[in-house]
Amino acid sequence: MAFVTRQFLRSMSSSSSASAAAKKILIKHVTVIGGGLMGAGIAQVAAATGHTVVLVDQTEDILAKSKKGIEESLKRMAKKKFTENPKAGDEFVEKTLSCLSTSTDAASVVHSTDLVVEAIVENLKLKNELFQRLDKFAAEHTIFASNTSSLQITNIANATTRQDRFAGLHFFNPVPMMKLVEVIKTPMTSQKTFESLVDFCKTLGKHPVSCKDTPGFIVNRLLVPYLIEAVRLHERGDASKEDIDTAMKLGAGYPMGPFELLDYVGLDTTKFILDGWHEMEPENPLFQPSPSMNNLVAQKKLGKKTGEGFYKYK
């Protein structure tokens, strides 16, 4: 009797696992909205892993620039990866680019896609308008995902009729190099959608981690308050920015100090995230604005990209 019971339970378990696996969507066709640094990076890694990818932006000029950047990135990767076999490197670049196409008409391509990844400017109104429009044209099974780093996924998903097929996919810059992807599950995101996205991230060679739809998710929720506290330490005159950076590199083992990292990321980017959180939770001491950072942003001193931030760059 015990043997029969074990066999029955094993059979039920196998059937259940097979059924659950069958429910997941195998993502083969990906549409990336936004040809900027993040969107182009996401498109590149998806194409490099054999997915059919369409990169969408407003103009052909933007897309041409994006595709050129992707090609240059692939050539650099091929040179490092295929040092002993340049021909294999050329084939890798050619094969990846053959999986990638571009379009200025998102509505015309989403009807046949498995996944839409949005990587446009961090503006809730624009994201809502985009997804509300795409929702009318996308296939029933299509999953929507936002690469937002600061907005809540629920507030973006509410513009659609597919909240159960909506989640966050937060990649990190530079996308081809950074292994981490935060998969954000809202209260409405189905388990099928979540598992499909986790599997997709793994096919990209990434390491997915899961987080609820909380401000900043995991990395930014820990990182931004740390960066701002370093700025406050400097604002109070407790230590110089140089000594703070040195202390965190030599004492905590961080590869970059907080001021170096702020300049690398862009002061405007960090300010945008902090301002959004402060608006949501004005009494939270972690989210209070930084006068010195606000002053630098007002002067357009945004970090390395403008030649000056907390430090000056030649």
UniProtKB/Swiss-Prot annotation:
GO terms for biological process: cell differentiation; fatty acid beta-oxidation; negative regulation of insulin secretion; positive regulation of cold-induced thermogenesis; regulation of insulin secretion; response to activity; response to insulin; response to xenobiotic stimulus. Residues 1-12 form a transit peptide. Keywords: Acetylation, Cytoplasm, Differentiation, Fatty acid metabolism, Hydroxylation, Lipid metabolism, Mitochondrion, NAD, Nucleus, Oxidoreductase, Spermatogenesis, Transit peptide. The modification N6-(2-hydroxyisobutyryl)lysine is found at K127. Pathway: Lipid metabolism; fatty acid beta-oxidation. The modification N6-succinyllysine is found at K80, K81, K87, K136, K185, K192, K202, K206, K212, K241, K312. One of its GO terms (cellular component) is mitochondrion. NAD(+) binds at G34, G35, G36, L37, M38, G39, D57, E122, K127, S149, N173, K305. Pfam families: 3HCDH, 3HCDH_N. GO terms for molecular function: 3-hydroxyacyl-CoA dehydrogenase activity; identical protein binding; NAD+ binding. Its EC number is 1.1.1.35. The keyword Electron transport does not apply. The modification N6-acetyllysine is found at K75, K81, K87, K125, K136, K179, K185, K192, K202, K212, K241, K312. Expressed in liver, kidney, brain, and pancreatic islets. Disruption phenotype: Deficient mice display reduced levels of plasma glucose, elevated plasma insulin levels, increased plasma 3-hydroxybutyrylcarnitine and increased urinary 3-hydroxyglutarate. Islets isolated from knockout mice have increased amino acid-stimulated insulin secretion and higher sensitivity to leucine-stimulated insulin secretion. Increased body weight, reduced litter, smaller testes size and weight but does not affect the epididymis. Succinylation at Lys-81, adjacent to a coenzyme A binding site. Desuccinylated by SIRT5. The record marks H170 as: Important for catalytic activity. It catalyses: a (3S)-3-hydroxyacyl-CoA + NAD(+) = a 3-oxoacyl-CoA + NADH + H(+); (3S)-3-hydroxybutanoyl-CoA + NAD(+) = acetoacetyl-CoA + NADH + H(+); (3S)-hydroxydecanoyl-CoA + NAD(+) = 3-oxodecanoyl-CoA + NADH + H(+); (3S)-hydroxyhexadecanoyl-CoA + NAD(+) = 3-oxohexadecanoyl-CoA + NADH + H(+). CoA binds at S73, K80, S149. Gene3D superfamilies: N-(1-d-carboxylethyl)-l-norvaline Dehydrogenase, domain 2 (1.10.1040.10), NAD(P)-binding Rossmann-like Domain (3.40.50.720). SUPFAM superfamilies: 6-phosphogluconate dehydrogenase C-terminal domain-like (SSF48179), NAD(P)-binding Rossmann-fold domains (SSF51735). Belongs to the 3-hydroxyacyl-CoA dehydrogenase family. Mitochondrial fatty acid beta-oxidation enzyme that catalyzes the third step of the beta-oxidation cycle for medium and short-chain 3-hydroxy fatty acyl-CoAs (C4 to C10). Plays a role in the control of insulin secretion by inhibiting the activation of glutamate dehydrogenase 1 (GLUD1), an enzyme that has an important role in regulating amino acid-induced insulin secretion. Plays a role in the maintenance of normal spermatogenesis through the reduction of fatty acid accumulation in the testes. Homodimer. Interacts with GLUD1; this interaction inhibits the activation of glutamate dehydrogenase 1 (GLUD1). This is Hydroxyacyl-coenzyme A dehydrogenase, mitochondrial. It comes from Mus musculus. The lineage of its organism: Eukaryota, Metazoa, Chordata, Craniata, Vertebrata. The gene is Hadh.
